Amino acid sequence: MSGLVLGQRDEPAGHRLSQEEILGSTRLVSQGLEALRSEHQAVLQSLSQTIECLQQGGHEEGLVHEKARQLRRSMENIELGLSEAQVMLALASHLSTVESEKQKLRAQVRRLCQENQWLRDELAGTQQRLQRSEQAVAQLEEEKKHLEFLGQLRQYDEDGHTSEEKEGDATKDSLDDLFPNEEEEDPSNGLSRGQGATAAQQGGYEIPARLRTLHNLVIQYAAQGRYEVAVPLCKQALEDLERTSGRGHPDVATMLNILALVYRDQNKYKEAAHLLNDALSIRESTLGPDHPAVAATLNNLAVLYGKRGKYKEAEPLCQRALEIREKVLGTNHPDVAKQLNNLALLCQNQGKYEAVERYYQRALAIYEGQLGPDNPNVARTKNNLASCYLKQGKYAEAETLYKEILTRAHVQEFGSVDDDHKPIWMHAEEREEMSKSRHHEGGTPYAEYGGWYKACKVSSPTVNTTLRNLGALYRRQGKLEAAETLEECALRSRRQGTDPISQTKVAELLGESDGRRTSQEGPGDSVKFEGGEDASVAVEWSGDGSGTLQRSGSLGKIRDVLRRSSELLVRKLQGTEPRPSSSNMKRAASLNYLNQPSAAPLQVSRGLSASTMDLSSSS
């Protein structure tokens, strides 16, 4: 028993052992019990040998047997202690495993709580986005309704394009006219969507009869916005041509041009440029590098680069197209002038104004020399050149060109410029002078000279753009009255162009208006003519014997009247506007009929537009 060492320590009262300390003590006790058992086994073995000896000698046998029994009891107690220690160690191991599992579960709970919080945050964010989306949808629905209404107005307010006969020359291509036929409202935007309906057989390679029907169908579907039909048609035809004729056939180049047109209308400029590059390679290899069809494809490719803002890359392509056309057609051909216009637009977007002026002036000389001064291209080129002058601050040169355009449009209708027939810009400047000298009552009213543009081509966007640009130039110069006159005239010309009956009858109406004027009742009478649906100002004819018209409206009232007139115009064109129950003194403020005699009343069968309401006699 002397070798038994128990690892017990005196602990202070109330001290609570930790789990590690208990395990350590248990292991120490177990080791002590193991040592004690070994010692007892050795003693018991010694006693057994002693008993055997005593049985032979017979001395002190009982005492030895008693010691053996005590040792066996001690061995049993030691075995019991060892079993309990092993149970405690196994229990401690199990508790440690349980605690480890408990920690794992706690970690999982923490992760689940974090995920739950993240999901809550995501749900809250999704709910906020859903709320914003619903608000945006509601706003878009309102905007859609508003745009539908504006679309109804625009349907009748679109600028009509003057139809011009196009020569069936082999120098044009189906995509050759990608630049605008009419000037854009924003002079800085020179490149715009072209006219895609030009027949492809007008290009450098004539479309075979077997492809013409397909080409017409594709153009029709593209014009209707049905690209989901037009694109598969083009691709199928392209595959058939490549299979039957080979990739390098000119028919394939033509079909590539048509498919590029459809892609361009979808604003897929990269795909369209890739197709045009393929078409260019085919045409250069089959038709030669100086063929007009190659020039047309180069021009189309330059336009696509321009639409993507790659003006530097587009300029050499356009320059090469110009060189080919000059070589094939001569330097004074109208198509050369058209290419010069396109090149000028590209240079203008790069700020190369000297080159822009040179190209426009040369194109203008070609148009005037080959097509005459009254050709619409002359006015368009002058308008473009004036826009270039405006960008450089050359306001005097721009003003001169704008006045030339308006004067030429006036001469085309009336044949000359005299005191009775003055261009609108002259009236605008006279009105400005009268405004400065405070003699409104003695001036010619806007309504009397505002009808000149009706007899001209009021649907021409060139004239309309010129009116607005010159009005903006006047406003920059501080000529507010003249600017207002031109702006009102431009606005009214657009609205007048919505009524086809008015367009065909206006010259006749103006002819009747020379002698028709309402006579005054007496010295004390006053008849007031208020603006009708499309009125721009209200005027009053004072019965003081002077026979002068006085302006009595304001610009704010004008805008309100114009806004109401647009709604009435849509209802009238849709056939839903109620007809007036009786004739009254109201009518359009243009006063085109003040000069008409009472003996020549308007016929009901004339089909008046919204801007020519019935006007009864003042008697």
UniProtKB/Swiss-Prot annotation:
Pfam family name, one: TPR_10
Modified residues (Phosphothreonine): 612
GO molecular function: kinesin binding
Region (Disordered) location: 154-201, 510-531, 598-619
List of residues that carry N-acetylserine: 2
First and last residues of every TPR repeat: 55-88, 211-244, 253-286, 295-328, 337-370, 379-412, 464-497
Signal peptide coordinates: none
Keywords, sorted A to Z: Acetylation, Coiled coil, Cytoplasm, Cytoskeleton, Microtubule, Motor protein, Phosphoprotein, Repeat, TPR repeat
Coiled-coil blocks: 32-150
Main location: cytoplasm
Sites of Phosphoserine modification: 174, 460, 519, 565-566, 590
Superkingdom assignment: Eukaryota
GO cellular component annotations of the record: cytoplasm; kinesin complex; microtubule
Compositionally skewed regions (Low complexity) per UniProt: 609-619
Family under the similarity heading: Belongs to the kinesin light chain family.
Record note on quaternary structure: Oligomeric complex composed of two heavy chains and two light chains.
Record-given protein name: Kinesin light chain 4
Gene: KLC4
